[in-house]
Amino acid sequence: MKRQKRDRLARALSKGYQAGMQGRSKEQCPYFAIDARSHWLGGWRQAMEDRPGLAK
């Protein structure tokens, strides 16, 4: 049975979260499409909130 590919927007969110947890800048977002970019940035923002030791 073939495995379905994950939703592209869910993948963008996940990749953004991973980038945020690694401390990468939001300027390094690889997506140009508005929807994918906004999901990537949403994941990045969530990671910034979840990262320990960062005070704003």
From Swiss-Prot:
InterPro entries: Ribosome_modulation_factor (IPR007040), RMF_sf (IPR023200). The keyword Cytoplasm applies. One of its GO terms (cellular component) is cytoplasm. It comes from Proteus mirabilis (strain HI4320). During stationary phase, converts 70S ribosomes to an inactive dimeric form (100S ribosomes). Keywords: Cytoplasm, Translation regulation. GO terms for biological process: regulation of translation. It holds the Pfam family RMF. The lineage of its organism: Bacteria, Pseudomonadati, Pseudomonadota, Gammaproteobacteria, Enterobacterales. This is Ribosome modulation factor. Belongs to the ribosome modulation factor family. The keyword Cytoplasm applies.
